[in-house]
Amino acid sequence: AIKSAREQKALRRAIAANDALLAALLPQLRLGLSEWEIRNLLRREADRFGQGEAFDTIACVGANAAECHHVPGDDVLGPGQPLLLDFGVRLDHYCADMTRCIAPQRPRALFRKLHRIVHEANRRAIAAIRPGMTGQEVDEVARSHIGKAGYGKAFGHGLGHGLGLEVHEGPSFSPRGT
């Protein structure tokens, strides 16, 4: 979707609020917090930095971080475990959306390896974007890199999407993207 200059400014403000939310959250994270508690911290910060959540916040630890839309539960954050955060604030009706996977203390070797693969796939996809490309073509750049690394079957979601008044707007960067 094409955004006016006013809409772009509003989206940048929502995304900046989301960045501030993450910066405020990180010092509050500690080992032993449950997914539920972490999600509630995110919700509280979404109220502080925006006008609440743009969508239901996801916080998941350990093996749960591999589930794209895991419902937070009682599992607790342990040393070196991945912590997946998927959250966004709503600010002046515009939605932000951010997914981050972090690890407290020293992340395990597999986490570091997978993080490098995903980071490189994302970098390649962004670098490949050209006028006229479809979302499907951009998604394929990342999907190809992850597949060549041996993890293609684990890539069960799209690469990304546009933002606006709704959290999921066009374009869609996925195998079905336009």
Where on the chain are the PLM-derived regions?
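Active-site neighborhoods and metal-handling regions in enzymes and metal-associated proteins
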Residues: A1-T178
